[in-house]
């Protein structure tokens, strides 16, 4: 059964021809003469041998298998040019990237410059560290740290009291004018007026500060009347005590 397939296979080839077509019969074989190829070693083709079972199977064409062209020469195709220039690659690219010495880096000028720049940068950072400028908002804020109280001079307090008696609520424009006149910030003026209104409410036992000047004047008038009434009452009591004595 096996001889039938072998005989049918050998009828397609003449005596002396190989089972495989010749390498030069391919269409692109003619163009290989101008292309460089890579050689892996001078003895690669000579040491290559077929497996013995192939020759035993094709016993009729054992003589033809021994005439394969790749066994006669180390290279099946004639090599032209340096093997290192295959497809434009230089032989330098076959060097190892790791463990390269400075002598090898001379051929790679850009690589040498890059490595030298990295070393210089590290040396500069170690030798002369750049001083960082710290701004007030960059400083860490402690949990228990409080902002210091603003102290006002007598002149500033007097002017603020006058402004408060004239108008307890300042507009944005007036607050800017007062802050520039007294050398304070808008925030400081705003906080002072807030504290002053709270103080007034405590002194007058009021839950709400008067929203208008007329209402404030009415409250002040009532306060004066109470003081006068209490003064007359205390004066009458003093007179009664003097009479009794």
Swiss-Prot record:
UniProt cross-references to SMART domains, sorted A to Z: HOX (SM00389)
PROSITE patterns: ANTENNAPEDIA, HOMEOBOX_1, HOMEOBOX_2
Motif (Antp-type hexapeptide): 134-139
One annotated GO molecular function: DNA-binding transcription factor activity, RNA polymerase II-specific
The keyword Transcription regulation is assigned to this record: yes
Localization in the cell: Nucleus
Ranges annotated as DNA-binding: 145-204
Pfam families: Homeodomain
Region (Disordered): 202-245
Biased composition annotated in UniProt, kind: Basic and acidic residues: 202-228
Cellular component, GO annotation: nucleus
Keywords assigned: Developmental protein, DNA-binding, Homeobox, Nucleus, Transcription, Transcription regulation
SUPFAM superfamilies on file: Homeodomain-like
Main localisation: nucleus
Coiled coil: none
GO BP annotations listed: cell population proliferation; posterior lateral line neuromast primordium migration; regulation of transcription by RNA polymerase II
InterPro entries attached to this UniProt entry: Antp_homeobox_TF, HD, HD_metazoa, Homeobox_Antennapedia_CS, Homeobox_CS, Homeodomain-like_sf, HTH_motif
Keyword Transmembrane included in the entry's annotation: no
Record's function text: Sequence-specific transcription factor which is part of a developmental regulatory system that provides cells with specific positional identities on the anterior-posterior axis.
Similarity comment: Belongs to the Antp homeobox family.
Protein's UniProt name: Homeobox protein Hox-B8a
Organism: Danio rerio (Zebrafish)
Native organism taxonomy: Eukaryota, Metazoa, Chordata, Craniata, Vertebrata
């Amino acid at each position: 059964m096996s001889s039938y397939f072998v005989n049918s296979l050998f009828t397609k080839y003449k005596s002396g021809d190989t089972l495989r077509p010749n390498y030069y019969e391919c269409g692109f074989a003619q163009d290989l003469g101008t292309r460089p190829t890579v050689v892996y070693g001078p003895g690669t083709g000579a040491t290559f041998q077929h497996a013995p079972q192939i020759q035993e199977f094709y016993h009729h064409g054992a003589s033809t298998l021994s005439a394969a062209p790749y066994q006669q020469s180390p290279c099946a195709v004639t090599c032209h040019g340096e093997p290192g220039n295959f497809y434009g690659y230089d032989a330098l690219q076959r060097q190892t990237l790791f463990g390269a010495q400075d002598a090898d880096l001379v051929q790679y000028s850009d690589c040498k410059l890059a490595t030298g720049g990295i070393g210089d940068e590290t040396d500069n950072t170690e030798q002369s560290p750049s001083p960082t400028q710290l701004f007030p908002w960059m400083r860490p804020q402690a949990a228990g740290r409080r902002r210091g109280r603003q102290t006002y001079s007598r002149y500033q307090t007097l002017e603020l009291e006058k402004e408060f008696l004239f108008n307890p609520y300042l507009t944005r424009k007036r607050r800017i004018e007062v802050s520039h006149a007294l050398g304070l910030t808008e925030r400081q003026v705003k906080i002072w007026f807030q504290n002053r209104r709270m103080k007034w409410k405590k002194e007058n036992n009021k839950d709400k500060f008067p929203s208008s000047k007329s209402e404030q004047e009415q409250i002040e008038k009532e306060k004066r009347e109470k003081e006068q009434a209490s003064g007359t009452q205390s004066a009458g009591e003093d007179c009664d005590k003097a009479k009794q004595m």
